[in-house]
Amino acid sequence: MSAMNIAVLVPVKKLDKAKMRMADTLDRSQRRQLMMVTLRRVLSALQKAQIGDVYLVASDPQVKNIACDLCVKFIPDQGDELNPSLELARGELCQNYDALLVVFGDLPMISDKDIKTIVRLGSSKPSCVIAPDKRNVGTNVLFLHPPYLLPFTFGGNSYERFRSNCEKLGVQFLVYQSQNTALDLDYPQDILDLAALRGHKISGLEEILDPGVLAQISQVTSMSGAKMGA
């Protein structure tokens, strides 16, 4: 699709530590299942887009198995901190690439069309393209052309940090707004939003998207909201 030589990094936490904000509504097994299914969906979209070489950055053996199953390259993650891990991966790879795409593995609705559009938006050099979360606070997808354009500053309020760094450097900053890329699965409410958008038809998530489970999640989120408002 693209004349650019692109590296794609998909960072993944250890599955036992994933989605801890949902611990009050989903048990450990359900959280692992949620992460594995959404990760496979993200990797499938990336493979269908055919925009570059895909690398999973992780330390979990089960994630490595997914990489093997889908013929995706695997980079062992040597640390627990996201930004240093990504910097190490970029340092190992990106001297051989024209651009870098970072996609998180908890985007159940992302499509190959979304990925192609983001790359197309960032085709001029230098440029940074961000797909923010639905709160316009975090960053779910980041495209850098060239790969070393900006330091990684993922974490709370990363959207504003990337924007500010682009402004300081005089770099083109572009935003891709899409329901598909905005919905990440960090909070119990995100499960309810996914069910509202897609019903109960995501293969592998039938148990989590069961109406009974959704009712329990809705009750917990309502109680949490009431406590915050009290």
Swiss-Prot record:
GO terms for molecular function: GTP binding; phospholactate guanylyltransferase activity. It holds the Pfam family CofC. Its EC number is 2.7.7.105. Pathway: Cofactor biosynthesis; coenzyme F420 biosynthesis. InterPro entries: CofC, Nucleotide-diphossugar_trans. Keywords: GTP-binding, Nucleotide-binding, Nucleotidyltransferase, Transferase. One of its GO terms (biological process) is F420-0 metabolic process. Phosphoenolpyruvate binds at residues 139, 155, 158. It comes from the Bacteria. Coiled coil: none annotated. Transmembrane segments: none annotated. It catalyses: phosphoenolpyruvate + GTP + H(+) = enolpyruvoyl-2-diphospho-5'-guanosine + diphosphate. The keyword GTP-binding applies. The exact nature of the substrate is currently not known. This entry has been annotated based on its similarity to Actinobacteria. Belongs to the CofC family. Guanylyltransferase that catalyzes the activation of phosphoenolpyruvate (PEP) as enolpyruvoyl-2-diphospho-5'-guanosine, via the condensation of PEP with GTP. It is involved in the biosynthesis of coenzyme F420, a hydride carrier cofactor. This is Phosphoenolpyruvate guanylyltransferase. It comes from Thermobaculum terrenum (strain ATCC BAA-798 / CCMEE 7001 / YNP1). The gene is fbiD.
